[in-house]
Amino acid sequence: MAQFSESVDVPDMGRRQFMNLLTFGTVTGVALGALYPVVNYFIPPAAGGAGGGTTAKDELGNDVSVSKFLESHNVGDRTLVQGLKGDPTYIVVESKEAITDYGINAVCTHLGCVVPWNAAENKFKCPCHGSQYDATGKVVRGPAPKSLALSHAKTENDKIVLTSWTETDFRTGEEPWWS
């Protein structure tokens, strides 16, 4: 029978082993930090609330306050916000007290360029290939084959909430192509 002493000496960690562990920890931390945004890219965003809507965001990513929005915009103004699926969406000021009940998706139906509002000509004009849309987003001149997509815009707790438009397109009388 072998006798074991109670005080078993554990050898100290050598300098080389310590440096290896330190290097491994550093490389692992940097690699995980670099992989985090890549992994997040492939994870879909969380679903909207019970209403399925998306709160409109300004250019800084803050929720758009309806009262402040109406104070700083004139009747008839069309202003870009971040809307459904992160798409740029125009909010239209209907009166000093209200916005229209719809938002206009600013992505051109031809090749996907963002279509700016031209207030002087009272229409949207695509800078890529010249497509033109009227004040409601209905296509009036190609090469764009379809009108700009719509979304419902409503006010909840002083915020603009955008929801999917699934009803008949009031501009064309047809079923919406985007739903």
From Swiss-Prot:
* Principal location class: membrane
- Rieske domain: which residues? 61-162
**PROSITE patterns given for it?**
RIESKE
Q: How is the cofactor bound?
A: Binds 1 [2Fe-2S] cluster per subunit.
Cysteine-cysteine disulfides: C113-C128
Q: Which cofactor does it need?
A: [2Fe-2S] cluster
Please name the SUPFAM superfamilies in this protein's record: ISP domain
| UniProt GO BP | photosynthesis
Q: Which Gene3D superfamilies match?
A: Rieske [2Fe-2S] iron-sulphur domain, Single helix bin
Where in the cell does this protein reside? Cellular thylakoid membrane
InterPro entries, per the entry? Cyt_b6_f_Rieske (IPR023960), Rieske_2Fe-2S (IPR017941), Rieske_2Fe-2S_sf (IPR036922), Rieske_Fe-S_prot (IPR014349), Rieske_Fe-S_prot_C (IPR005805)
- So where does this one cross the membrane? 21-43
GO CC annotation: plasma membrane-derived thylakoid membrane
Sorted alphabetically, which Pfam families does this protein's record hold? Rieske, TM_PetC
So which domain of life are we looking at?
Answer: Bacteria
Its job? Component of the cytochrome b6-f complex, which mediates electron transfer between photosystem II (PSII) and photosystem I (PSI), cyclic electron flow around PSI, and state transitions.
- Return the PANTHER family for the record: CYTOCHROME B-C1 COMPLEX SUBUNIT RIESKE, MITOCHONDRIAL (PTHR10134)
What else is on record for this protein? The Rieske iron-sulfur protein is a high potential 2Fe-2S protein.
State whether it acts alone or in a complex, and with which partners, per the record: The 4 large subunits of the cytochrome b6-f complex are cytochrome b6, subunit IV (17 kDa polypeptide, PetD), cytochrome f and the Rieske protein, while the 4 small subunits are PetG, PetL, PetM and PetN. The complex functions as a dimer.
Q: What is this protein called?
A: Cytochrome b6-f complex iron-sulfur subunit 1
Q: Where does this protein come from, organism-wise?
A: Nostoc sp. (strain PCC 7120 / SAG 25.82 / UTEX 2576)
* UniProt lineage: Bacteria, Bacillati, Cyanobacteriota, Cyanophyceae, Nostocales
Provide the gene name from the record.
petC1
